[in-house]
Amino acid sequence: MSGVGGPALKLGVIGLGRAFGLMLPTFAGDRRVSLVAATDTREAARRRFAADFGGQAYATAEELCADPAVDAIYVATPHQFHAQHALLAARHGKHLLIEKPLALTLEDCAAITEAARAAKVHLVVGHSHSFDAPVQRLRALVASGVYGAVRMINAINYTDYLYRPRRLEELDTAQGGGAVYNQAAHQVDVVRFVAGGEVTSVRAVTGAWDRARPTEGAYAALLTFAGGAFASLTYNGYGHFDSDEWQGWIGEMGQQKLPGTAAPRKVFASQSEEAAFKNARNYGGENYDPGIAAPPVAHNHFGTLLVSCERADLRALPNGVMIYENGVARLDALPPPSVPRSEVIDELYRAVVDGVAPLHDGAWAMATMEIVFAMLRSAREGCDVALSHQVALA
């Protein structure tokens, strides 16, 4: 890790919901960052933040962004508010860590990127699963040239995504809900990172098969890269098959799972009851579980990732990369993480403290979102979609 003995980056948080809860073990375990301020619409979440971290808990994002003690802002609000809050933070000269997706339109993606450039602040978009250590290791193996060029990628994930407790807007594609906005951004980022970044065209189909949850729960897409490689992306969030079975029953967050122990699908009497149930499990809620006491046994993952190079196939696993070459399979093993998702802090810290330009910047995230938008358009219109905002891997 970079700069472990250096000054801690003072972080403010806009939005103490689900995304913050997933990143909290990282923030709590990595001494390169210090949580000093936060805001949320829920008073209970603000009170808990002040009690847990001794930081300032503000009623509004404007007050938080005006705090001179804050070096960087983590934007973890619902997707439809990312642009508003990112632009506000940039105007106050704060460095930015923004949850994926960057924004819900190309225009907003461009506006955020330009605002960060004009304010001379760094912008990192994540966590996305291209930060995962096994994916980073797989990319390093590709970059070594030992196995030749990437020719084909298959990314497959089956989860219960659509039936996890949801707010109403999370079931509305227009407000950033559904599997394409929320899950494809991960898969697209991963395959772009592995294959070099520049995608030329997209063809996709989507599935919305539950009238009670009328947004995309599944998709399949074919991406063609500038160098001739192609990637197939498949995602199903309808909760029948669990592809963690193919990861040795290691869950997405690196946690050990028991086969056949998926939680039964909860039925709610109303959407308001479902939203209340979700809020109660979020940070500051009465049923919140911080998940900090039990460290992960392996790295984060996003399902199967199988990369075909000219001279070998490479498969990312939660504990390393399997290399299949000339009839022999071997594991390039990685030790379990001491701090989950520390790769996000690596990139943010190097940018802000060491002045190293981040990979997952606004231009990179905008290129990822262009593909996500193209997937929705392709599915809607039944056509290939050409791309024009792609950038190569730096």
Regions found by a protein language model. Name each.
Residues 1-6, 72-74, 276-283, 287-298, ...:
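C-terminal helix-rich "cap/oligomerization" subdomain common to oxidoreductases
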Residues 46, 85, 112, 138, ...:
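Aromatic/hydrophobic pocket-lining residues that form π-stacking "cages" and hydrophobic walls in ligand
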Residues 121-122, 129-233, 237-255, 382:
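Predominantly a Rossmann-like dinucleotide-binding segment in NAD(P)-dependent oxidoreductases
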Residues 1-53:
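N-terminal Rossmann-like dinucleotide-binding module
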Residues 100-101, 127-129, 157, 362:
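Short strand-turn motif at the edge of the Rossmann-like AdoMet-binding core
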Residues 211-216, 226-344:
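NAD(P)-dinucleotide binding in Rossmann-like oxidoreductases
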Residues 37, 72, 152:
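Short, Asp-centered acidic motifs that coordinate Mg2+ and/or phosphate
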Residues 17, 23, 55-115:
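Beta-loop-alpha module in the N-terminal Rossmann-like domain of NAD(P)-dependent dehydrogenases
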